[in-house]
Every structure is written in structure tokens, then in C-alpha cells.
């Protein structure tokens, strides 16, 4: 198959699946194994490397928030929200690293698939039913300023678990925030911004510990194919970030939580199916 076409397909898969509760790693694993015949380790490393496109999309879409973060970092911001977001990202990223790096090193030798996402999906479905039954008394209303240290640590752990194949990073973090009572739009926004340092760290770890696999992956699809996949993933990601945030603003919490739950269960099932590819 033409490497340019492969790059476009992989870019679309990455750009869509990164932002919804279906593991982008698993989908890229399936596509790369089917189209390129890559082994598990090579395909997994390639999937993480492709997140360059989604990082670029997040930085572009949230450029105002990123600017505020940089100002807060050098103590030049006058906005309390910038410092709260900086604190949130620092803690979440540290916890993500402490949980995610050991899991990644473990995954290289022993792939674990869909169970975590399936369990999360069931929990979300139950939560959706609870919210519906108690909707007069309960509604996710928390914002960033309401999050306690314990809440932020939980989000970091949830994001770290996404190092496992079959576990969606956005699904874990968004779901954790909503289950903690954060309003949907804020939950999606915090989840998407959290991607930036987490994905940069994942790419660094991949290059550091899996140089051979990354080299094989790039060789399999060609450098031009890889670059095309990154560009396509960037543009597709921008579209999906905007669409998901617009949907979150509708405040259809019950529908949103149930959709997240169903997609998480589907992700778990797809991950188990993907086992046959490697």
C-alpha cells in the first residue's frame, strides 16, 4: 500500500481516537499491524510517537491557556486561574510519570488489554444512572478551583494507567474528573490540556527505552508517511477537540456519562480483539 495513504489513514485514526474514550494506542496498533505487519512492540512505540500531532493540536487550540501557564511559570501572570492550572498540571504530570513509566516498561514485555476500560465503562454507566435518578440534588458543578490535592492525585493516577494498551488517556482523565464532580466542559478541557506534558513524557520515554522499535516503525511507514500522519492527526484533532467541547457545553451530563461508559466498554472489547493482531 502507498505510504502516503497509510500515513493519512494512521493520522485520521490517531486524530479521532485520542480525544474520545477509545484507546488511540489500540486503534493504531490494529491499523499498523494490519497495514504494515508491525510487531506489538514496534506498533505500540509507533502509536506513542504519533502523539506529536495531537500535542500540536492541543497547544494550538489551548494557546491562550498555554500562554497563561508560561506567564505563571515565571510569575508574570496576574490571574489566579493560571497558577491553579499550573499547580494542577505539575501534580498530575508527576503522578502520571510515577504510575505510567513503570507500567510502560512492564507493557513492553507483557501486553495487558481491555479489562481496565471495560471496568471503567461499567462504573460510568452506573454513575450515569445515579446522576439521572438524583438529578434534582446532584449535578457536576466543580471547577478547577474546587479540586483538592486528593482529587488531582486521582486524576494523575487515572492518566498514568493509560500507559496500558487498551486504556484511553482521555477516557480515564475525563471520566475521573466527571466522577469527582467536575462540570463536563471543564473536565474535557483539563483532560485535553493534561495531554500535552503527559504525551511529551510518553514520547521521551519511548525514544529513550525503545529506540530500536521506533526506528523500525519509522522505516516501515517511511519518514514522509510518518510526517503526513502527524500533520493529518493535528488537523483532525483540532476539529474533534472543538466538537467535543461544544457538546460538553450542552450540559447533557447523563447522556455524556452514558456515552463515555459505552465507548469505554467498546474500547475494552476492541482491545481484546486486537490481541489477535499481535
From Swiss-Prot:
Reaction(s) this enzyme catalyzes, per UniProt: di-trans,octa-cis-undecaprenyl diphosphate + H2O = di-trans,octa-cis-undecaprenyl phosphate + phosphate + H(+)
Bilayer-crossing regions: 3-23, 42-62, 88-108, 112-132, 152-172, 190-210, 225-245, 253-273
Protein's organism: Saccharolobus solfataricus (strain ATCC 35092 / DSM 1617 / JCM 11322 / P2) (Sulfolobus solfataricus)
UniProt superkingdom: Archaea
Keywords attached to this entry: Cell membrane, Hydrolase, Membrane, Transmembrane, Transmembrane helix
InterPro entries: UppP
Its job: Catalyzes the dephosphorylation of undecaprenyl diphosphate (UPP).
Principal location listed in the UniProt entry: membrane
Transmembrane found in the keyword field: yes
Identification of the protein by name: Undecaprenyl-diphosphatase
Endpoints of the signal sequence: none
Enzyme Commission designation: 3.6.1.27
Entry's family note: Belongs to the UppP family.
One GO process term, biological-process aspect: peptidoglycan metabolic process
Keyword Transmembrane helix: yes
Membrane topology: Multi-pass membrane protein
Amino acid at each position: 500500500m502507498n505510504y502516503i495513504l497509510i500515513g493519512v489513514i494512521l493520522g485520521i485514526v490517531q486524530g479521532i481516537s485520542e480525544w474520545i474514550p477509545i484507546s488511540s494506542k489500540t486503534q493504531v496498533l490494529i491499523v499498523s499491524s494490519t497495514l504494515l505487519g508491525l510487531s506489538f512492540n514496534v506498533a505500540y512505540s509507533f502509536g506513542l510517537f504519533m502523539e506529536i500531532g495531537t500535542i500540536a493540536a492541543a497547544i494550538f487550540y489551548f494557546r491562550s491557556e498555554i500562554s497563561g501557564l508560561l506567564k505563571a511559570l515565571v510569575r508574570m501572570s496576574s490571574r489566579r486561574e493560571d497558577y491553579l492550572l499550573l499547580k494542577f498540571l505539575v501534580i498530575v504530570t508527576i503522578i502520571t510519570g510515577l504510575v505510567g513509566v513503570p507500567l510502560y516498561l512492564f507493557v513492553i514485555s507483557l501486553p495487558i488489554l481491555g479489562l481496565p476500560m471495560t471496568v471503567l465503562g461499567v462504573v460510568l454507566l452506573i454513575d450515569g444512572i445515579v446522576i439521572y435518578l438524583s438529578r434534582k440534588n446532584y449535578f457536576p458543578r466543580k471547577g478547577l478551583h474546587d479540586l483538592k490535592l486528593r482529587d488531582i492525585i486521582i486524576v494523575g493516577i487515572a492518566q498514568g494507567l493509560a500507559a496500558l494498551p487498551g486504556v484511553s488517556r482521555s477516557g480515564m482523565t475525563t471520566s475521573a474528573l466527571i466522577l469527582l464532580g467536575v462540570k463536563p466542559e471543564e473536565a474535557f478541557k483539563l483532560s485535553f490540556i493534561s495531554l500535552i506534558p503527559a504525551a511529551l513524557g510518553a514520547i521521551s520515554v519511548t525514544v529513550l527505552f525503545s529506540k530500536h522499535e521506533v526506528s523500525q516503525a519509522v522505516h516501515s511507514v517511511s519518514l514522509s508517511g510518518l510526517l503526513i500522519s502527524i500533520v493529518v492527526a493535528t488537523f483532525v484533532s483540532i476539529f474533534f477537540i472543538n466538537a467535543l467541547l461544544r457538546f460538553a457545553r450542552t450540559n447533557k451530563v447523563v447522556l455524556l456519562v452514558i456515552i463515555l461508559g459505552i465507548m469505554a466498554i467498546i474500547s475494552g472489547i476492541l482491545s481484546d480483539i486486537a490481541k489477535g493482531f499481535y
